[in-house]
Each structure stands twice: as C-alpha cells, then as structure tokens.
C-alpha cells in the first residue's frame, strides 16, 4: 500500500453509527458500526474486536487521521440511552488507543459547517 497517501477515517459513534475511510479524498470503504448483542435483554453495543479488525484489515496506522464525532446528550434521550452511547464512545476511543491510532474529536457543528450542512436535514449529512 502506498503510504504517501492521506488517509482519513471518519467515525460516527454509537450502535447506529458508521465508519468511512477516505484515501486521497476518495471514499474507499464505508460500513455500519460493528455491533454485538450482549446479555439476555438483547442489548446492542459496539463490537470492539470487530472494529479493531476493520481498522487493521484496512491497514490504518499511526500516520493516518481518525476523526471521531464528539457528540453530547440529546434532549429526551434518558439516562440509560446516554450511558449506552457513552459506553460505545469509550469502546471506540479504547480501540483507537490500543492500536496507537491518532484520534481527533470533532463536534458535529464543526464538520457540518465545513461541508455547508448547518441548518440542513439530517439526511443531507448522510450522503
């Protein structure tokens, strides 16, 4: 693999999130956040081992940039929902730390402003 290329990994955290890899500005891979079911209540959570496998198989290394959306509590989400989201966020940070990947936290308003998506429908940011 040509290591002279710029590689950016964008991660939308949470069990409904996704991963996108750009190489020299071109999307080369997208996938849903890997999840697993935990316990008898069928609680979904981020699958740390599978996330690590994705990053390793895509040859993501210390020279690449990992951008993790840094989101905060949403009105009406509830304590259990926020705890679950925080757990997912922590799993992603832990996987990146274990793989020695440089992690950059970016607030939604910053990346949406960069792509002129402020005040747009949520679906506009998914395309």
Question: Which sequence ranges carry the predicted segments?
Answer:
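Phosphate- and other anionic-substrate recognition elements at nucleic-acid/protein interfaces
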Residues: 1-127
């Amino acid at each position: 693999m040509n290591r002279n290329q710029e590689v950016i990994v964008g991660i939308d955290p949470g069990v409904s999130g996704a991963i996108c890899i750009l190489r020299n500005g071109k999307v080369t891979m997208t996938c849903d956040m890997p999840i697993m079911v935990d316990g008898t209540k069928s609680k979904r959570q981020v699958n740390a081992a599978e996330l690590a496998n994705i990053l390793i198989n895509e040859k993501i290394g210390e020279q690449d940039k990992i951008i993790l959306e840094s989101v905060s509590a949403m009105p009406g989400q509830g304590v259990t929902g926020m705890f679950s989201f925080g757990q997912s966020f922590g799993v992603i940070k832990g996987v990146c730390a274990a793989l020695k990947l440089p992690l950059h936290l970016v607030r939604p308003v910053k990346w949406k402003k960069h792509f002129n998506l402020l005040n747009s429908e949520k679906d506009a940011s998914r395309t």
